[in-house]
């Protein structure tokens, strides 16, 4: 745990008592603050009370004595409308911050030179975060990984020399971190997402920009420049005098890091050097993972990690569950769990990575459906449609792609495995990449992906991928 000493002797309200909120309560209390815990969920309030915290309905207390409101990232700060606790705080002139802001203040107080790598982007954040954490561990760092990837930042060990914090940040978390100042900041990409919480794509992109704009003096801002928003951001950072490393997997760069034919290449001052090779690394398959790997490589190089260690780390990276996860093989058939593919953009990355696909798709549909994926239809040998989206997706596939409405995941896995094996194709792939949320049949994408893995591994003759 990281004791938060910056509010010692003061009273702090914490709203939102899930994982990060409860960790904030413990960290503030350990640092000497008085904590008033609150949540709209009575169950969460009861848990906080059982943990020994003072709880209250913040609508019924005076805000005059609060030094800050620590807000959970899932609570609306601005859009669609600010949460009532935010309005109360603003009326009382109380600053509204998040748990990562508390971390930043503690780092500046106690270990300002401790490495702090922050990662954001619309897609690829978790894989890049996990990959950088893996690389730093291979390089011998005491590595602490957390943030949006799942572990509350304040439950990690405190910053210190030789210890690196590798932190995934959502746009919500950036919004709540006004003094964000990583030593290495990474912006992978920006595409339309979470507009319900940010109002416009311009505001969403501006929030993302703050992570790389806030990099501390002497640090490195790493920006993927394969979309227009990020190209503009990189140019603005240049003009502001930041040390910018541009990343591309689509075009060679005169200065920066790009990927060509499976090789990560660095160019600077007219010189070109090969940094690492991605060929044969199953956990980093696909153009999207090439971008993740290139950004991670740039971070590793910025931290002084050698190319030999970098290459070893890339090759030994196991990948993340539910993200292009190779869960088994039977004869000519590879089974891939990409349950994290909850929208068409994410699924496009998976479909672009294989040639002969038996595709399991569907769930709770999102706006636009799969119409943007028509360019990948020639790669799909047959589709197996599940959940609420089945009829809609069937209409989009029409006569272009052979398909069936399997309705449930167990039926889809059974039929896709049978058809893929019977196809005689050398590299057939049964791919779960639903292009949908899971909520019609599963509580979250993790449970859906775990069910897929279990179904595959229960098939006779399926072996682990080595």
From Swiss-Prot:
InterPro entries: KARI_N, Mur-like_cat_sf, Mur_ligase_C, Mur_ligase_C_dom_sf, Mur_ligase_cen, MurD. Pfam families: KARI_N, Mur_ligase_C, Mur_ligase_M. It is found in: Cytoplasm. Pathway: Cell wall biogenesis; peptidoglycan biosynthesis. Its EC number is 6.3.2.9. Cell wall formation. Catalyzes the addition of glutamate to the nucleotide precursor UDP-N-acetylmuramoyl-L-alanine (UMA). This is UDP-N-acetylmuramoylalanine--D-glutamate ligase.
């Amino acid at each position: 745990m990281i004791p938060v000493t910056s509010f010692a002797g003061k009273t702090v309200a914490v709203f939102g008592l899930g994982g990060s909120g409860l960790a904030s309560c413990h960290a503030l209390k350990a640092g000497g603050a008085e904590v008033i815990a609150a949540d709209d969920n009575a169950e969460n309030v009861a848990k906080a009370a059982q943990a020994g915290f003072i709880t209250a309905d913040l609508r019924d207390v005076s805000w005059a004595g609060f030094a800050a409101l620590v807000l959970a990232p899932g609570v609306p700060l601005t859009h669609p409308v600010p949460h009532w606790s935010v309005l109360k705080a603003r009326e009382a002139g109380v600053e509204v911050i998040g748990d990562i802001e508390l971390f930043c203040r503690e780092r500046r107080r106690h270990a300002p030179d401790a490495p702090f790598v922050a990662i954001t982007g619309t897609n690829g954040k978790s894989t890049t975060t996990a990959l950088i954490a893996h690389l730093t561990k291979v390089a011998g760092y005491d590595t602490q990984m957390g943030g949006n990837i799942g572990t509350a930042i304040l439950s990690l060990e405190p910053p210190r020399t030789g210890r690196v914090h590798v932190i995934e940040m959502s746009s919500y978390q950036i919004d709540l971190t006004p003094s964000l100042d990583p030593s290495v900041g990474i912006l992978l990409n920006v595409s339309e997402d979470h507009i319900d919480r940010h109002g416009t794509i311009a505001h969403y992109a501006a929030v993302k920009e703050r992570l790389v704009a806030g990099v501390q003096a002497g640090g490195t801002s790493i920006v993927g420049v394969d979309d227009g928003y990020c190209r503009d951001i990189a140019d603005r950072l240049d003009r502001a005098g930041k040390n910018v490393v541009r990343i591309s997997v689509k075009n060679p760069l005169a200065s920066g890091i790009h990927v060509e034919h499976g090789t990560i290449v660095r160019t600077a001052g007219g010189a070109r050097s090969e940094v690492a090779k991605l060929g044969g690394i199953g956990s980093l398959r696909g153009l999207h993972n090439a971008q993740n790997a290139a950004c991670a490589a740039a971070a590793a190089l910025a931290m002084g990690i050698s190319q030999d260690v970098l290459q070893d780390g890339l090759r030994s990276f196991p990948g993340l569950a539910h993200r292009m996860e190779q869960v088994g093989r039977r004869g000519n058939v590879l089974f891939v769990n990409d349950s994290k593919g909850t929208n068409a953009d994410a699924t496009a990355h998976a479909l672009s990575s294989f040639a002969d696909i038996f595709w399991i798709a569907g769930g709770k549909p999102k706006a636009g459906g799969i119409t943007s994926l028509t360019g990948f239809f020639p790669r799909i040998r047959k589709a197996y449609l599940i959940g609420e989206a089945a009829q809609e997706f069937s209409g989009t596939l029409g006569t272009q792609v052979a398909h069936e409405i399997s309705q449930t995941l167990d039926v889809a896995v059974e039929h896709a495995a049978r058809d893929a094996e019977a196809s005689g194709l050398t590299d057939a792939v049964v791919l779960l990449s639903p292009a949908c949320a899971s909520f019609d049949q599963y509580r979250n994408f993790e449970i859906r992906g775990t069910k897929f893995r279990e179904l595959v591994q229960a098939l006779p003759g399926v072996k682990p991928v080595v």
